[in-house]
């Protein structure tokens, strides 16, 4: 879908849950829709980093895995917008306003896409793991050393070492604990930054927690990790343990990347400022989900759904001033 000047009503940048709900709502408004996603599939962070994680704070789902939520969001999007165009493995690097008021989106490979309105639903932006300064661990990346849990069954019956003290590390430890043979969690301090409820679950689990411990090195046979040496950072005393997998859960660093050069008003170099309509400071460009900011903003999947519905409705009014910003309820629309 590159090289043509086919014009879309709205283009969403990012196909996470917020973006997918935006596709659904754009379909409800009869908008010709395109989605550009830097990853090879829909789902954003949930699909790339936490597909096996259970989510508890989405209305209507007491408990749902991230993978299943993404599947449900895509199914919903397809139900209202089956003709939406998805473009994968493309990162939007440039956003240009053309003389006729429409937008040209240029990707990192030079593809050009055209749209009347743009909604940025890119989550936390581009992200990559915070790698620890340990050469032995880097040598075994993908060979037993992981930065996320994307395939839970591979940890079944395994001896797992998890490193970190934030939400990522604690979540990973709790995810693999029911199926792993043994789980050890080490943290360089005695204070954890994870959510209070997660820490309660950790305390009640069979995870071996060792504070003031860090990774010295990992060893293996060249094909897969076999051992890990950890040390007490107060005494320097080393302990070598047998491991089958090492999960480095030290979080991810995110960046807005080239979006910082688009002329958008940015909060703390991390989020795009929007008003109550989801509008940025550039007319016709909106933002929703974790990537947007306004006073009182709460970064939740649930709030992203409401934000993108607001953005889509106002984008519709922007490209078609004669249409209503609020079209009525979905039950009325779908039953016509």
Curated annotation (Swiss-Prot):
Question: Which top-level group of life is the source organism from?
Answer: Bacteria
Q: Which transformation does this protein catalyse, written as a reaction?
A: 2 reduced [2Fe-2S]-[ferredoxin] + NADP(+) + H(+) = 2 oxidized [2Fe-2S]-[ferredoxin] + NADPH
Necessary cofactors: FAD
Recorded GO terms, molecular function? ferredoxin-NADP+ reductase activity; flavin adenine dinucleotide binding; NADP binding
Keyword line: FAD, Flavoprotein, NADP, Oxidoreductase
Q: Which residues bind FAD?
A: 18, 37, 45, 50, 92, 127, 290, 331
The cofactor note from the UniProt entry for this protein is: Binds 1 FAD per subunit.
Q: Does the keyword Secreted apply?
A: no
Name the InterPro entries for this protein: FAD/NAD-bd_sf, FAD/NAD-binding_dom, Fd--NADP_Rdtase_type_2, Ferredoxin-NADP_redctase_2
E.C. number(s) listed in UniProt:
1.18.1.2
Do you know which SUPFAM superfamilies this protein is assigned to? FAD/NAD(P)-binding domain
State the family named in the UniProt similarity comment for this chain: Belongs to the ferredoxin--NADP reductase type 2 family.
Query: What interactions and quaternary structure are annotated?
Result: Homodimer.
Know the name of this protein? Ferredoxin--NADP reductase
> Could you tell me which species this protein originates from?
Symbiobacterium thermophilum (strain DSM 24528 / JCM 14929 / IAM 14863 / T)
């Amino acid at each position: 879908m590159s090289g043509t000047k086919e014009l879309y009503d709205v283009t969403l940048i990012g196909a996470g849950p917020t973006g997918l709900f935006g596709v659904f709502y754009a379909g409800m408004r009869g908008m010709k829709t395109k989605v550009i996603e830097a990853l090879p599939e829909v789902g954003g962070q949930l699909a790339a980093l936490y597909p096996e994680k259970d989510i508890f704070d989405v209305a209507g789902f007491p408990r749902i895995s991230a993978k299943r939520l993404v599947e449900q969001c895509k199914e919903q999007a397809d139900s209202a917008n089956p003709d939406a165009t998805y473009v994968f493995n493309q990162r939007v690097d440039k956003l240009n306003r053309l003389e006729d008021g429409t937008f040209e989106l240029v990707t990192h490979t030079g593809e050009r896409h055209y749209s009347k309105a743009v909604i940025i639903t890119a989550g936390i932006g581009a992200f990559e793991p915070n790698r620890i300064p340990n050469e032995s661990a880097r040598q075994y990346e993908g060979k037993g050393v992981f930065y996320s849990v994307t395939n839970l069954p591979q940890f079944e019956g395994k001896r797992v070492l998890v490193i970190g003290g934030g939400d990522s590390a604690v979540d990973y430890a709790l995810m693999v604990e029911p199926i792993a043979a043994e789980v050890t969690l080490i943290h360089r301090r005695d204070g954890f930054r994870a959510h209070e409820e997660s820490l309660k679950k950790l305390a009640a689990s069979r995870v071996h927690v060792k504070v003031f411990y860090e990774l010295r090195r990992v060893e293996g046979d060249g094909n897969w990790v076999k051992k890990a040496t950890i040390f007490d950072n107060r005494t320097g005393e080393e302990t070598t343990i047998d491991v089958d997998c090492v999960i480095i859960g030290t979080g991810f660093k995110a960046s807005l990347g080239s979006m910082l050069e688009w002329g958008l008003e940015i909060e703390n170099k991390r989020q795009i400022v929007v008003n109550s309509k989801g509008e940025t400071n550039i007319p016709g460009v909106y933002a929703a989900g974790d990537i947007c900011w306004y006073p009182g903003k709460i970064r939740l999947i649930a709030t992203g759904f409401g934000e993108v519905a607001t953005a889509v409705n106002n984008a519709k009014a922007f490209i078609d001033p004669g249409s209503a910003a609020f079209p009525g309820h979905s039950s009325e629309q779908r039953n016509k």
